[in-house]
Amino acid sequence: MNVLVINCGSSSLKYQLIDSETESVLAKGLCERIGIDGALTHQPAGKDKIKSTPAMPDHKTAIGIVIDQLTDKENGVVESLDEIGAVGHRIVHGGEKFTKSCLITDEVIKEVEECSVFAPLHNPAGLIGVRACQELMPGLPMVAVFDTAFHQTMPEKAFLYGIPRKYYDEDGCLLYTSDAADE
């Protein structure tokens, strides 16, 4: 099965199309400057990078451009969306609610929104990507993959080490180490 992996930032979108059986990357790319002037780098496996500057006023447009690149007659790697079995979305913060990846439902979206207080730059952007993919690829399973899930498998003494207990008891704060630590 081919899986489209999406990592949305506030003005960027990284993607890979992966054959899950062989674990090979069929194509990868980056949409940058979404909402500004747009820049795309697309690289099918074994081919040179293709760079262009299509208008990308929003993430939905950017994801549409990614789909067009993946299905392009000359530089695409699949003939249609029918060859994609699922979409995986990087979600930075799932709080204590998510200990592993999960299918995205309305309830999952609501809970990720609630966790956005802990990742205000990343979670809203991730959800924009989820909603855009749901619109453009209806019926495809969407999966949330949480950066914080690893931390939910740690013993309490490890994730509370270094912070006063009251921060956890009153606000749900935990000690996480990741690239989102600046938030």
Question: Which stretches of residues belong to each language-model region?
Answer:
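Short glycine-rich, Thr/Ser-proximal phosphate-binding strand/loop in the N-terminal lobe
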Residues: S12-M56
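A structural motif corresponding to the C-terminal end of an alpha-helix
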Residues: G129-M142
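Conserved active-site "lid/cap" helical segment
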Residues: D37-G85, G129
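Extreme N-terminal starter segment of soluble prokaryotic enzymes
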Residues: M1-V3
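Residue-level signal for inorganic ion chemistry
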Residues: N7, C31, V87, D147
